Amino acid sequence: MIKNFVLSTFVVVLTALCPFGAFASQPQNKICRAYCTYYGDKLPDPNIVTHINYAFAELYVVDGVYKTFKLQGNESRFRQVMALKKQNPNLKICLAFTHTVSNSDNRQGGGFSKMSASPEMRKQFAADCLAFCKKWNLDGIDIDWEFPGLSWSGHASDPKTDTKNYTLLMKDLREALGNDYILSFAGYVMDMQSTDSGKKYVDIQAVVPYVDYINIMTYDMDAAPHFQSAIISSTSYYDCMSAIRSYAKLGVPFEKMLLGIPFYLRHSHDGLTTVVDYKQIVKLKSNPNFEFDLWDEEARTPYAKYKGKFYGSYDNPRSIAVKGEWIHSLGLGGLLYWENSEDDADMTLAKACWEAITKNYDE
């Protein structure tokens, strides 16, 4: 039933949209990318991931002038993650940069918006990234600027120039890193959009030649009473199919797209309770006020009820398996998940993600 759904509903649609001929090349080696945060309480199992993005490093921009960047949190956590390469020499580890500021010795002085507006500062940042990769034996850089042209978390933005400067930043990073290092970015579920004051988000067509992968954040696309990461949903603001279709229409190769998997339930975007991570879901299953692992056939996603009312949606092994077959059928590059520490003690979701990308679907 799943296979019929994938082939008839999704693959046929995207075949018509793909400008370079659908599925001419479906890579055999899929990516399973874990985001591992500086504040997390566990490490990924290096034998069930191919890539780790360490989150985060932050920019030090003082009065609009880029000075340097530093890891967020304690360096000891970063060292623990880097040491995982000893257990799996094939493991790739990249450093992810955020637009936010959390270090006590830093403040929001312009961030990506100011840094990317200057050719000199862009090149200095790119050179600093290369030096850091060489120092720590890192495999690449991931840019999580959320988002050009928007001001979230109090960071600076300029809708008139951010989108253009983002492209120039990625160009300078690729020139500095060369082809020996991975370059990726956290992608919104749609292309750049026009606003009254300029543009927001990323110019996908302009940026894609410079990057190896796009980590498409196919989660938080809606909140209760709708689904946050549905494959298809007639009621949610956006869904996985719409996101992948948006990128395919722009000519992005499927193998550069990574599908985002949330390790948490999304209840709301504001209020006292916004998310419930998977390890907490496991504990709440004994609470008689909650019902978990209810299934929506259209969305292909589990959801929960609280006292009989829709509470939120999330991913579980069943939905991850569906997405895994979907990834293989389309020839996507693989998946990413946010974030490792939200899994339960048995690493149930991490194992499901690994199974989803390593299973032989041709048997």
Name each model feature, range by range.
Residues 1-5:
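Positively charged n-region of N-terminal signal peptides that target proteins for export
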Residues 8-19:
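Bacterial N-terminal signal peptides
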Residues 30, 50, 89-93, 137-139, ...:
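Short, well-ordered coil/turn segments that N-cap beta-strands
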Residues 45-48, 77-81, 108-111, 121, ...:
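Stable alpha-helical elements in mature extracytoplasmic
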Residues 52, 95, 143, 173, ...:
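Conserved, mostly hydrophobic/aromatic
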Residues 96-99, 103-110, 256-326, 346, ...:
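Glycan-binding loop/region signatures in secreted carbohydrate-active enzymes
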